[in-house]
Amino acid sequence: VYPSNEDMLFEIPYATTYSGSVGVVIGHKIEGSSHIAYGKSDGWYYATLPYHASFDYKDTRRDVTCAPYKWAWNDEKGYIEQVFTEWRSIYIGKWSRMWMKTPQGPNVQYSSGINWPVIRYADVLLMLAETENELHGGPTDDAREALKEVRRRAFKAEDHARKVDDYVDAL
């Protein structure tokens, strides 16, 4: 039910129509769900403005992790649209029902079937870097390369020299 990627190594599975509230309580708010194929989402959890500001402005994960918008049905236009929110309503967009490949339908309101992540490949790379650092009293080439692999996912290729290589090499 979640976006297909090779990052997830282990997760807790939930059934599509009767378990898991990830994407309902955590995720973008979705208003006007009776018209929307993705169903309802309350978006009860928010990221803070300082957390949003802690991301590099070029980090492509920022506006997914800290989504300063919700989805709302526009009766006048007849479609769902992205509506920017005030600073107190920065949703956790990573677990949005809007990322689902197959929408559950407008009547599904309290379950999403979005699996809960336990360990990602990026977690393994970061643990490798930390272990290398601790075992060898400082960063090793393997530790730097592991950290660079994680950071490469965050920035466009044209920014890698500065935002990935220069950043990691300066540590």
State the predicted function of each range.
Residues 135-143:
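Structural helix-adjacent loops and short alpha-helical linkers that scaffold large soluble proteins
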Residues 1-127, 132-134:
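Elongated scaffold/linker segments in the mid-to-C-terminal portions of large proteins
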Residues 170:
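Surface-exposed binding/hinge segments that line
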Residues 157-161:
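Boundary/linker segments of alpha-helical solenoid repeat arrays
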